[in-house]
Amino acid sequence: MTSQLIKKIVTGDEIRNAFLKFYSEKLHKIIPSASLIPDDPTVMLTIAGMLPFKPVFLGLKERPSKRATSSQKCIRTNDIENVGVTARHHTFFEMLGNFSFGDYFKREAIQWAWELVTNIYQLSVENIIVSVFHEDEESAKIWRDEIGIHPDRIVKLGEEDNFWSSGKTGPCGPCSELYYDFHPEKGLQNIDLEDGDRFIEFYNLVFMQYNRDSNGKLTDLKFKNIDTGMGLERMAQILQEKQNNYETDLIFPIIQKICEIANIDYFSSDDKNKISLKIIGDHTRAVIHLISDGVAASNLGRGYILRRLIRRMVRHGRLLGITNEFLPHIATVGINLMQNNYPDLKNNNDLILNEIKIEEIRFRETLERGEKLLDELISSGQKLISGFKAFELYDTYGFPLELTVEIAEENSISVDVKGFEEEMNAQKERAKAASSNIDLTLEGSLEREIDLFNKTVFNGYDLLLSEAEIKGIFLDSTLVKQASEGQKVLIVLDQTTFYGESGGQVGDIGTIFSKDLEVLVDNVMRKKNVFLHYGTIKKGILTIGQKVKTNVSSSNRAKAAANHTATHLLQSALKSVVNESVGQKGSLVAFNKLRFDFNSSNPISKDQISKIETLVNSWIMENHALEIKNMSKSEALEKGAVAMFGEKYDDEVRVVNVPGVSMELCGGTHVKTTSELGSFKIISEEGISAGVRRIEALSGQSALDYFSDRNALVNQLSDLLKANPNQLFERVNNLQAELINKNKEIQKMKDEIAYFKYSSIKSSAEIVNSFSILVNQIDGLDGNSLQSAALNLTSHLGNKAIVILGGIPNPENRKLLFVVSLGDDPVKIGLHAGKIINEIARICSGGGGGKPNFAQAGAKDIDKLSDALDYAKNYLQKTLDSHSDK
């Protein structure tokens, strides 16, 4: 035995540490958890412990060692409706795993798994059942003959349960799973591993030994691999003897805090409240890790997943009776609970809490808008709320279906529940397709062929002109041997001076040429460290093996270099002027401008922008010489170098240092001294999503051109306003004051016209069953004036007033306006201005809405105005007559 038992392992931290220590002693290299934002473009989030090793399994990346072990944070949302409902479904979970890359195989994997669970975790043999693929006699034999498990404890299952594959083609193989039996007293006859109350699968051993081709044929892999996974939360439930994962020390402290805020007790709560508590507890862990790994709430991709999780937390908080802001308090508990194993949570504490706070406040406002939308649907007169609209309320505004149904029924309206379920199922299918599978296949000719090329050597930091050899030519993503004049091509070289788009910086442009060849290069991309040169052949024939020269446009390279250095200076200035916690969320370094996205909950003030510009320009004038060095990532971070949030870096990194000003990990091109930038100017600052701001700026010649254009504009305005530049401010102020006075005079005239028309009709009110009804047409008034006339008439007629006005503001526009205003008494007998105006406006192809005592609407068909007003009179006559009969 390689690991000696010291004490019984119980806590989540102890379980994790014991797993890693055990396999470390078996010569496995401990690999830190990768980010939840994967390098793999086929999946949105890290959904399995093996995902960071996918390039190794595909042979696209060198293995970190022959053996590896990790505790990988993961997120899955394809079964989100089961979170909190079942005992063990989660969005966020930790997967403990041990991996072999062409080293040990079934025997060692099974033996060590058994040693770990029985000797280290001290599980009783009586509580363990194992499953194997029914055709994998080798694994069954190891379990039976070498481990000594009784045959009755070995369950053979089919391909659906115990044969792992990533897709229709690619690496695959049988697996063996370990189950914990909570009720061994029930015996071993007729075991049903699908019985979730009795069994829980906690350790899966995948034996990756085959490759499946497009015909379904299995062939042995050259190197056989092991991929295992043990759910930390499930093992905690077992060892801590809890009813479910949520009551373990990994999650329950968060739930206790929720109970404290909601002033309820978990164990005496009903099932409905427990589900809400579990959902908030689960989602808290997912949310803090997503934000820490660089995800910002938005309506797309990962940002939408984050937003959806936060909104579910708010909604379930409301179901628990929590009406005030509470998520930051819950998140703080989650951070404190996990920061020892994930120190990035502590480092990003302020960012996490701020992002959650902003999103919670924003969603509470959104909920109010959702309630208004539902009110509009009800007041529109529809008798059925469609499944699409009900799902929109649920998905966009967080309105649960049962609440929509309840409110609709109160207003005698039905909801298309079946249509809602169809929309829900369609979304689930989209989610599963996007997040359930790890694709270990390479689709597309270009994708596959790129793997055939060696890494492109980039020598463009010091050179713009150099020699190279053509290694690959693509036409329409197909690898060819040659291409000719006029064709658009994608070229792979052995080495290049062209910078490939990365780190926000655009790719270089220029030419690839020889004596009889000229290719205009208009973009360069990087894919798997292979540089792809996009261009058009202007002269000659391009062939594999051809010797050429690469010539980068020096003017455009200089512009990009200046903007990239300016971006570094901008980030340092933001940290200095706004907040040290400001971090990059994205960037664009183009030839003509730069764009920088960063986290900030508030807009940057004009005063702050001025200070940022002044600071950057002072650094430019100080003529700092840049220092660029390669060093280990750990050394760079120790020296204080700034790394982009969520970005992946190699062990050796390139550090760009502006002494005393900025130090960042960066692979981009830069100027030699800051004075080469010339000048710096911010041209815009705006919010692009919740908690994320964007600055666009110029440097060098682009900044000078901007100043020149602005100066020309000032001169044009001076000529137009007949004032010299120094008097423009005063001149515009005077013009604005004159305009305000003129508008007041115009409004006064409109009010006089409205009063005249109001006075001419106020005596025409009719008395019906003691109510004063006035239905009339008033043309030539805008919306405000018509509203004012209606309110004045209502005030004049008193509590029993019913005023309905319609009119044409401007005959040329051919639009109608309607206003309905009611006194207190008509409202008391059930009249509703919003419902009345909808019926009237519909006659004229319009619509509107409002409150019980006041509403307004617009319409298009002016020829039906008289019909609409006649309808209003008849409707009121019938309604009031029927009321008098009661």
From Swiss-Prot:
Summary of the function given for this chain in its UniProt record: Catalyzes the attachment of alanine to tRNA(Ala) in a two-step reaction: alanine is first activated by ATP to form Ala-AMP and then transferred to the acceptor end of tRNA(Ala). Also edits incorrectly charged Ser-tRNA(Ala) and Gly-tRNA(Ala) via its editing domain.
Catalytic activity: tRNA(Ala) + L-alanine + ATP = L-alanyl-tRNA(Ala) + AMP + diphosphate
Binding site for Zn(2+): 564, 568, 666, 670
Natural source organism: Prochlorococcus marinus (strain MIT 9312)
Matches recorded under CDD domains: AlaRS_core (cd00673)
Record's comment describing the protein's domains: Consists of three domains; the N-terminal catalytic domain, the editing domain and the C-terminal C-Ala domain. The editing domain removes incorrectly charged amino acids, while the C-Ala domain, along with tRNA(Ala), serves as a bridge to cooperatively bring together the editing and aminoacylation centers thus stimulating deacylation of misacylated tRNAs.
Disulfide bonds: none
EC number: 6.1.1.7
Transmembrane regions: none
Top enzyme category: ligase
UniProt protein name: Alanine--tRNA ligase
PROSITE patterns: AA_TRNA_LIGASE_II_ALA
Keyword ATP-binding assigned: yes
Subcellular location: Cytoplasm
A single MF term (Gene Ontology): ATP binding
InterPro entries, sorted: aa-tRNA-synth_II/BPL/LPL (IPR045864), Ala-tRNA-lgiase_IIc (IPR002318), Ala-tRNA-ligase_IIc_anticod-bd (IPR018162), Ala-tRNA-synth_IIc_core (IPR018165), Ala-tRNA-synth_IIc_N (IPR018164), Ala-tRNA_ligase (IPR050058), Ala_tRNA_ligase_euk/bac (IPR023033), DHHA1_dom (IPR003156)
Annotated gene: alaS
Cofactor entry: Zn(2+)
GO CC entries: cytosol
This protein's UniProt keywords: Aminoacyl-tRNA synthetase, ATP-binding, Cytoplasm, Ligase, Metal-binding, Nucleotide-binding, Protein biosynthesis, RNA-binding, tRNA-binding, Zinc
Single GO BP term: alanyl-tRNA aminoacylation
The keyword ATP-binding appears for this protein: yes
Pfam name, any one: tRNA-synt_2c
Entry's cofactor comment: Binds 1 zinc ion per subunit.
Protein family according to the UniProt entry: Belongs to the class-II aminoacyl-tRNA synthetase family.
